[in-house]
Amino acid sequence: MKKKVMLGVIAAMVVSMSATVFAGPSIGQIIPEEPQIVSTNVPEGAKLVVSTIDVTDEKTLDNYTSNETVKTLLKTVNDEETKPTIETVKEVLKEMNVEDVTNVETKSGEKVDLTEYKFTTPFIDIAEQIGDQITYKTNGDLEVKVKIDAAKEKKAEDLLLMLVDPETGKVVFITIDEIDPVTGELKVTLPFLGAMTILDKSAEAA
């Protein structure tokens, strides 16, 4: 764990309570919702902090991550003036050990073609905080329920959660455990915390 300057608008929560997560139907439109932590394998006194990731200021971004590849990915996806695609970040993903975007293994072992998916939310940051210490490591997998507006009227099989460790640059693609298409509530299992975004392969993807 180490001290970090948290970015953007920060919301904090005790793990047994709820917090504000930012997500939205399109890049640049971020809508707060309230997630729930399902898992109980969290340290006493821990909080989750959730924030937007400001990619417009180099010093702020440097405080978030020293990994140049992660910086490039975040800048590309969180650019409000463009519509990033998997194709535009393909070379960056190669540097993150995603060699073939058409044949990627998810955390659960499924094979997916990322080129079928579109980014529907910018990257946001989720971290664990104890006092003034921040960590992206978890004590095993962490089950989370979170409402995301972009997930409304969607099917679980059409969505992927992309999660990036800002410290190591590790990237994982996570299938959705459960979904409520009416509220947009997703249940997902996270192996660590960090920068996350939602990918959608349905025809209605933004």
Where are these regions (language model features)?
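Solvent-exposed loop/turn and edge beta-strand elements of beta-rich ligand-binding domains
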Residues: 5, 20-21, 123, 138-141, ...
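Gram-negative bacterial Sec-dependent N-terminal signal peptides
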Residues: 1-23
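Self-processing/autoproteolytic domain segments and adjacent N-terminal interaction modules in large
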Residues: 53-137
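Sec-dependent signal peptide cleavage junction
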Residues: 15-32, 205-206
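Proteolytic-maturation and junctional protease-sensitive modules
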Residues: 136-205
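A generic structural signal for short, non-catalytic loop/turn and secondary-structure boundary residues
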Residues: 16, 41-43, 137
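Proteolytic processing hotspots in large secreted/extracellular or virion-associated proteins
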Residues: 26-36, 108-160
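N-terminal segment immediately downstream of the Sec signal-peptide cleavage site
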Residues: 25-48, 53
